Curated annotation (Swiss-Prot):
GO CC terms: cytosolic large ribosomal subunit
Name of the featured protein: Large ribosomal subunit protein bL12
Biased composition regions of type Basic and acidic residues, renumbered to the chain: 99-125
NCBIfam families listed in its UniProt record: L12
Amino acid sequence: MSAATDEILEKLKSLSLLEAAELVKQIEETFGVSAAAPVGGMMMAAPGAVPGAAAEPEEEKTEFDVILEEVPADKKIAILKVVRTITGLGLKEAKDLVESTPKPIKEGTNKDDAEETKKKLEEAGAKVTVK
């Protein structure tokens, strides 16, 4: 390895759990990726069609996407507040997300978190699906 990568690795080893979680969140936001996506099944499913078909349903049982389908105009502000709370997005980003439905609010989350997110959004008046 190069000196630069060795140095980065040593700095990563010294991070606390909280700092590591913040780093993951910043990387996800900066590069538009999800740390949950490269679990292995998705990338490995592409080369082999038959084994991939068997692996995908297993992942779908443990990882869920919460999709904001519809936002009634009279409920937009309440839904916007809930979206900001759930995602941690800024006002402009959350507004853009709410106005461009259907859009995923959370991806690759567990069942309990997906159901809780759906409940909060539906209480605010949004139409939501969990896939």
